[in-house]
A protein has these predicted regions:
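Short amphipathic, positively biased membrane-proximal segments
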Residues: 1-173
Length: 173
């Protein structure tokens, strides 16, 4: 690999990481808007699709991941407050890392940015939410959730993918 192509891959990774960070924030905003709209439509009768277990005390996958990382690295579980603080760190770190992978992929194969990043978001949803998290015991198996939860996750990740690609393209120039 030439120095020029290595430099381009690094630039792509950096642009993708920035895109992934912005996209992680945008995804959070989208999910809050979805939950508010659902609450208004249903009169608050249904739980939020993102709260796969439901309720204020439910631990999401990022909190469980943070706890698992702490257990491996520090030999101890996190407290509830520590999980609440560490969960977003996991979310944004994962978003940045996946954005960096995406940015490098686009440098190697420009067709990877097809359809403005929607396929990237959809693949990430399938790989993370539907396969990796259940396999690692960080969420229930996909069959345990209603179709609306899967749709919520897919659309949320499509928002992440489009935002990652948009920001990556702007940063990369």
């Amino acid at each position: 690999m030439s120095e020029t192509s290595e430099a381009n891959i690094l630039k792509g990774m950096l642009a993708g990481a920035v895109g992934g960070l912005v996209a992680s924030w945008t995804m959070n905003v989208f999910q809050k808007a979805w939950a508010a709209a659902e609450k208004q439509i249903t009169g608050g009768k249904q739980g939020q699709p993102g709260d796969q277990k439901g309720g204020e005390d439910a631990e999401d996958a990022t909190m469980k991941t943070a706890d698992r990382i702490s257990e491996v690295l520090q030999g101890r579980h996190l407290t509830r407050d520590e999980k609440k603080k560490a969960g977003p760190v996991v979310h944004y770190a994962f978003g940045a890392i996946m954005g960096a992978v995406y940015g490098a992929s686009v440098e190697v194969n420009p067709a990877a940015n097809a359809m403005a990043g929607i396929p990237f978001g959809a693949i990430l949803f399938a790989a993370a939410d539907e396969v990796a998290l259940p396999a690692l015991g960080l969420s229930d198996k996909p069959a345990a959730y209603p179709l609306s939860t899967h749709l919520y996750g897919l659309v949320s990740h499509a928002v992440y993918g489009v935002t990652t690609e948009t920001v990556r393209r702007i940063v990369r120039g």
